A protein has these predicted regions:
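Short, acidic/polar
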Residues: 67-89, 148-158, 224-238, 306-316
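N-terminal signal peptide
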Residues: 12-31, 501-506
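Substrate-binding cleft of secreted/luminal carbohydrate-active enzymes
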Residues: 290-296, 301-413, 419-420
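Active-site-adjacent substrate/metal-binding segments within catalytic domains
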Residues: 28-118, 153-157
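Aromatic-lined substrate-binding rim segments of carbohydrate-active enzymes
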Residues: 79-140, 188-218, 277
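Active-site groove signature of glycoside hydrolases
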Residues: 152-186, 216-218
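Noncatalytic carbohydrate-binding groove/subsite architecture in carbohydrate-active enzymes
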Residues: 184-314
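C-terminal GPI-anchoring signal of eukaryotic secretory precursors
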Residues: 455-494
Length: 506
């Protein structure tokens, strides 16, 4: 009996040590992503981060939120809606989710934690369809309402606290606004650029308590493309804050899923990459949206199914990886309200962009839950994303392709209005916890803070704070490896001791 008690006690001792070691090794928050040149890199491993994203807006088929645009579905209280979708996206091989708008007054801790556990990063839109919550289609300065800057501060504080926030977007396709001025999409650009400048200045003023998350914008893919890249990269009043840290185009150019099975056959994409190369944009460029649905491709009776060869090419073909960092497929689920007859059928429809749809037809995410049903093209995207060869490019060996800051195009105004006179919000010091680990836990340096309104010298090199922070992350990762090895050795010793005890008791 004594022998059994001793063995039982030893087993409990080993189990508790093993559990403690495993808990100590677990790290729910993924390393944050940093920029260098026109690439994204993992701040811990130093390896290039290639985007394999999906635009996410799970609009129900019915109910009071059926007609609501850009409702925030990823708050803690909607966990029953988004959590099953994260499992689907993880299966798909997705590492990035694009959100168009969020409610900064609500908690997103659960969503961001669950994304991080699955290795998923999040791009956050700062605008919303509410009054004065976005750049409006009006002449400057009216197109940039004061309330928008207040909202942006709220959104920044709500999401910069998470290590897996990939970036913030100050606008989506504002260059389609043509009701005022020249009717060529350039009229509201000074408002967008002023808004970008102000958000970046605010972010710089918060680096004493928050990571400086890359801030950029998404643009409709309309020519002349070089013009948009030049405008949002050029420096106004010698202030780095007036430049986007990344840009997303929304191109829908690869539309032949049957004839274009190899990259060399895609004239649309190759032509696009040539334009990007000639423009020499020095910072990360992505497909904010992609996924043309006009192809003649029927699978299991479902028409216009996408092959998604482009989803693989953009992260493997050198012509593409040299110019873009990846992209976001549009979109997770077909929005019934955008269909011609608002009916879910197998027929082609210009508004059918989902890789799946919700069932039943009257589901509302409430009384009647919505179940995601994949289209046949879902399997194509899964193949593309899960078989993509990982990049071997490292941050330490990469020196950038394009280094010059682009000049402002003469045909677009750079007369930017002053920063709105609104109350500046206090920078968040929150450290949300995921599986016992705090986010926003990097060592802050108050000396890096730039006072709101002050200028920053323009540069195409990663800023020193980001580089230093990345180095610290790499050291942390190395320490984690050493800890794991030490833990393994300790456990081996314990197991040997227990085995010896067993032999003594026999």
């Amino acid at each position: 009996m004594l022998r059994l008690h001793l063995l039982y006690a030893a087993a409990i001792f080993v189990s508790s040590l093993f559990a403690a070691c495993c808990i100590q090794e677990a790290h729910a928050w993924v390393p944050h992503i940093v920029t260098k040149g026109n690439r994204f890199f993992d701040s811990a491993s130093g390896l290039e981060f290639r985007m394999k994203g999906v635009a996410y807006y799970p609009r129900p088929n019915a109910g009071k939120l059926y007609e609501v645009d850009n409702y925030d579905w990823v708050t803690d209280d909607h966990e029953a809606v988004w959590k099953p979708h994260l499992d689907i996206l993880q299966e798909l091989g997705v590492n990035t989710i694009r959100l168009y708008s969020v409610d900064p007054s609500k908690s997103h801790d659960k969503f961001m934690c669950e994304c991080s556990k699955r290795g998923i990063y999040v791009l956050v839109g700062m605008s919303a369809p509410c009054k004065n919550c976005a750049i409006s289609d009006a002449l400057p300065p009216a197109c940039y309402p004061d309330e928008l800057f207040t909202r942006a501060q709220m959104v920044y504080n709500a999401f910069a606290i998470y290590d897996n926030t990939l970036g913030f977007s100050v606008g989506n396709e504002n260059n389609l606004q043509k009701l005022s001025g020249k009717h060529d999409g350039t009229t509201t650009a000074p408002c967008v650029k002023a808004f970008l400048r102000d958000v970046r200045r605010y972010a710089s003023s918060c680096v004493g308590s928050l990571r400086a998350v890359p801030i950029g914008l998404d643009i409709a893919d309309i020519p002349p493309r070089a013009q948009w890249l030049q405008y949002y990269d050029c420096c106004v009043e010698n202030d780095e804050h007036s430049r986007a840290e990344w840009i997303g185009f929304n191109p829908y150019v690869e539309c032949d899923p049957k004839a274009h099975t190899k990259y060399a056959q895609s004239e649309g994409l190759r032509g696009l990459m040539k334009e990007y190369q000639q423009a020499e944009y020095p910072r990360p460029l992505m497909f904010g949206e992609f996924g043309c649905n006009l192809g003649d491709n029927t699978i299991d009776g479902f028409q216009a199914q996408r092959a998604f060869y482009d989803a693989k090419w953009m992260n493997e073909e050198k012509e593409m990886t040299d110019q873009i960092v990846g992209g976001n497929v549009f979109e997770f689920t077909t929005e019934r309200i955008h269909l011609k007859d608002q009916k879910l059928t197998k027929k082609r429809d210009d508004g059918k962009y989902g890789i799946g749809y919700f069932s039943p037809d009257d589901c509302d995410h409430g009384k009647t839950p919505c179940k995601f049903v994949p289209y046949p093209e879902f399997a194509n995207l899964k193949t593309a994303y899960t078989t993509t060869t990982p990049s071997t490019l490292t941050m330490s060996t990469y020196n950038g392709t394009h280094r010059k800051i682009l000049k402002c195009p003469k045909q677009m105004s750079i007369e930017l209005q002053p920063t709105p006179t609104v109350t500046l919000l206090k920078c968040s010091v929150a450290q949300p916890v995921c599986s016992g680990t705090k986010a926003n836990a990097f060592k802050k340096n108050p000396a890096d803070v730039i006072k709101m309104g002050d200028k920053k010298k323009p540069s195409n090199r990663g800023d020193s704070n980001t580089a230093t922070d990345a180095a610290k992350q790499q050291n942390t990762a190395s320490n984690g490896v050493r800890m794991a090895r030490s833990t393994t050795g300790m456990l081996s010793s314990i197991l040997l001791a227990v085995a010896a005890l067993w032999l003594m008791l026999l």
